[in-house]
Amino acid sequence: MAALLLTSMVWSGHAQEKNEMDLSGEWAFQTDVMDFRRGSLDVRYCHRLQESIVLPRITDDYKIGYKSPYRHLDRLTRVYEYMGPAWYQREIEIPAAWKGKRIFLYFERTHWLSSVYVGKEEVSKIDYISIPHNHELTQWLHPGKKELITFCIDNRYQYDTHKWDHAHSEFTQINWNGVLGEIKLVAVDPVYVDDMQVYPDIKNKSIKVKMTVRNCTEHTASGKISFHVTGKDYRLQKEVPVTVTDSITYIEEEMFLGKDIHLWNEFHPNLYTLDCKLTSSVDGQSYAHEKSTTFGMREVEAGEDHIILNGEPIHLRGTVENAVFPKTGYAPVDDASWERVLRILKEYGMNHMRFHSWCPPAAAFRMADKLGVYLEVEMPMWGKDAQPDEKRWNFFRRELRGILKEYGNHPSFILYCNGNEITGDFSFIEELTATARQLDNRRLYSGSTARTRVKSDQFYITHQTTKGHMGIYEGRPYTNWDKNKELGVGLPIISHESGQRCIYPNFEEMKNFTGPVQARNFEIFRELLDKNHMLDQAHDFFRASGALTAIEYKDVIEAQLRTYLKGGFQLLSLNDFTGQGYAPVGILDPFWNTKGLITPEKWREFCAPTVALLRFDKRALYNDEVFEGKAEIYNYGPALLKNAKINWRITDSNGKTLKSGKLKTQTVGKNGVFPLGSFSYALDNITEPQKLTVHLSVAHVKNSWDIWVYPRHSNLMQSTSEVLYTTVFDEKAKQHLADGKKVVLCPKPSKVKGRKSVFHNHFWNPIMFKWPPMTIGCLIHDDQPIFEHFITSYHTDWQWWDILENAKVIEMKDAPVALRPFIQVIDHYDNNEKLGIGFEAKVKKGSLLVLAVDTQKNINERPATQQLLESIDRYVKSDKFAPQITVDESYIESFLKK
């Protein structure tokens, strides 16, 4: 345990302000893994603590706890694990000027139960997870004297909640112990504003201020409340008299802001500040208290299909924030960290963030307010948490009210959901949702994501409606599709956890895990790859699988945008998810740094407030066909596109324009998806295989799509005296090889023992979801002469669709180490077996090429497969086909069914 020995620790009370005392700094400290101190007033357990720690921090920062020897496969490994009570202590001199005031001990963020002792007496305990802990200590503190304040933070599970809740799971942010953010004593006069909520009314250009005033004097207090509203080039003052007769008095005041109010939204995140000063007197004694909050003039309603903000439909383009913070192990509480994350979010054209089964600290709300990001917030609730358990239910009831009170004024807080994929007693979920709607109508509410709807739902995050499956997790080899027929169910539907296509881990990231968690699972993955003699290909696997995931995201997002009846989508996620099996599904790493797979500028071509869209039926065509495109525009930007010029063009791989045209200049509406017109291009002038790019620009926005054009081929796979084409490895093929000739073996996929072949890379991650075939794309050895007449990159793209969907993956663990397939399928990182669809080898005196692709099924409708076979034919009939790696006949027979 790294800790300093304390000689004396007395805090004299250097307050930042006269009514606040900053308590950050050194505290006496002691762990209590056996829980000896809890609830005991025995003198043995009330001694001065002998170690020290500096707050705000967490125990992991000081290497406190059990040093883990493990290498967790399914998550990052916490280096120093501590779960249990930890004690913090300081002697503090309470200012004499605080006599007669109410005194609170404030922790901005802690985890999970905090208990406070003054001297030997336990005086307060709080178990919120989502909001600050504010302990009133008035009764036990004596201004002008030194007091020994001890508090205990217990990060054990206080209730039987789901172990994956992102608020306290080791799978995301760690289950830390400590205090973060502000730690302070606060003194207020006995008549003070306990709560102040601002309710905007944009129709009447006014606000309603709802206040809770506490009077602890036991006498009537009379005075006034002074309101001061400021904004951009705006000031308003108002005073109202007030009489506080009871211990709690509720006050409402309406304020007209004027004719020219500034609304808050993603494009114009205008903010106002309300400063309130309560001055009062009781029996000649004067009191004063000030409270401030920011707010935005915005109203949220549930439309038929979309969320309505300030009277206009919006469309959410979001990601899920899963509390992944490997640098610190906890969610940051400072503005700069959240501003960075949310600016990156907006840089990628997104306007929305869902906090999956957790609620962020105030800094996240402040920065979302500032930058114009729509937030959906949840409690730490998941799975079985709705099953009957009154203690747990009461915790959720308190947590809900706390979240609404603490963060309710933030205009970015437009959506609330109880939690993730909840099961159990949905009458309890309905109770929570109905209660929230009754308490605070400033946002929309939903019972749960992706499970059963409840009566009070105002929106629903799901992949399934009563009309069918409307989730979108991968693209298709065409773009003329959407999910509109599965929608139109009477309330806004947001697509649940879209995307989730796995990328091979980038082992270069391992050096970045310098905080309380380490990527020791990467060590296991790397060792497996090394054991299978492919470590030199690790970065190629990352690049190839990552390129495919980026391609998938473009198609997933464009399909979401074409689905005009959908209220929005949430990716899972823009950055990697480090738990539940480790899911590297993001185009950003866990630290929100780029992986180098796609630039923000390119991403914004298909994910932005305004996006040009194109519907077409094929990505791979013959040159006797006509490409036909139907242009659309997704426009949820701030304005109409007046007199928008619409241009299209088709270019070859060198950027040369082959054909261009214009569609009708028109004014495009906003808050919807609008058809623009059609165009076509006859491909008969394309005589050689080509990759073409279709470009579409609408006013200032542009987008593009790749297509592949091939000539038709007949008489494919024709054997000669030197080259034998066959689907079976029979005696004829063996003799051909023994004679020093060439054989091309294309076994039917049903005759290969290996895995299913698919275009898409694995969903989510292979450790949690062990769904076959457990592959994550292909590495194409495009520099080899076999691809001289087949256009490809090092990764698969849409021209590979019909090839891969009609193939079989050969498991090649018994192949010679040096043998690398030219179509190399990337195995999941928890296995790292060598896999292939096509390879070549020397067998006896001959040369063998194996291609585990169905070369007969609907071959006239498969232009890319035809072209691959043509390229192979030219290759094997040339001198370039000269395999150097030798395999036995028995190896070939080992992966073929008899």
Model-predicted segments: where are they?
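Substrate-binding/catalytic cleft of secreted carbohydrate-active enzymes
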Residues: L342-R343, H352-L588
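Extended acidic/polar, glycine-enriched regions
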Residues: H142-K146, R214-E301, S678, N685-L716
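Aromatic-rich peripheral "rim/lid" segments of glycoside hydrolase catalytic domains that contact
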Residues: L439, L572-G637
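Catalytic beta-strand/loop cores that center a nucleophilic Ser/Cys/Thr
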Residues: L439, P749-K753, N765-P863, K880-K898
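Beta-strand-rich binding/interaction modules
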Residues: V116-V118, S206-T243, I251, V626-T665, ...
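Active-site-adjacent substrate/metal-binding segments within catalytic domains
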Residues: Y62-I94, W98-V118, S124-D127, P190-Q197, ...
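Accessory beta-strand-rich segments of carbohydrate-active enzymes
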Residues: Q30-M34, R78-V79, M83-V193, C216, ...
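Extended carbohydrate-recognition surfaces in non-catalytic/accessory domains of CAZymes
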Residues: Q16-Y106, H162-T172, W176-V179, T578, ...
